[in-house]
Amino acid sequence: MSANEFYSSGQQGQYNQQNNQERTGAPNNGQYGADNGNPNGERGLFSTIVGGSAGAYAGSKVSNNHSKLSGVLGAIGGAFLANKISDERKEHKQQEQYGNSNFGGAPQGGHNNHHRQDNNNNNGGFGGPGGPGGQGFGRQGPQGFGGPGPQEFGGPGGQGFGGPNPQEFGGPGGQGFGGPNPQEFGGQGRQGFNGGSRW
């Protein structure tokens, strides 16, 4: 059981030490919950070890003089990359569990329950008629309107969250809510800010 699962489950066990004697054969009574069916910690350690060793091998092969420094740097880079890949796979797996939890309809427009995750389906919520504009805050990417599939229409409503990729929070006014892919917010007349500027 990971630390996150442990603390979010509300099942913080109790530690009962009895004169440093180990109880054998006694039932566990749920005090030390071992989650043998879900060895995520072992998988993370395994991916770190494999990534580190692959990085060390690649680092030593890239270097002409086979220095230890290039091997160590390769190991660190490989372990880091392996952990990033592992995290992305966990996010993708978690996202598939909640894949189609999109709600929509006027007057709020669509609402996508994913917060900055990429599931590559076009299930953005349906929006109502185009809102009165306002300002949207996004990072980089093309401007567009949210909505399902290629129609890409925004809807009215207050502030809310967009779908995955570079969408950010909606600003004041009646912006519609975007779906997945690089769609951004906007109201009437494609108002919304996408550039690299920040507020």
Curated annotation (Swiss-Prot):
The keyword RNA-binding does not apply. It is found in: Mitochondrion. Residues 124-163, 170-179, 186-199 have a biased composition (Gly residues). It comes from the Eukaryota. Residues 1-48, 89-199 are annotated as: Disordered. Residues 7-21 have a biased composition (Low complexity). Its main location: mitochondrion. This is Uncharacterized protein YNL208W.
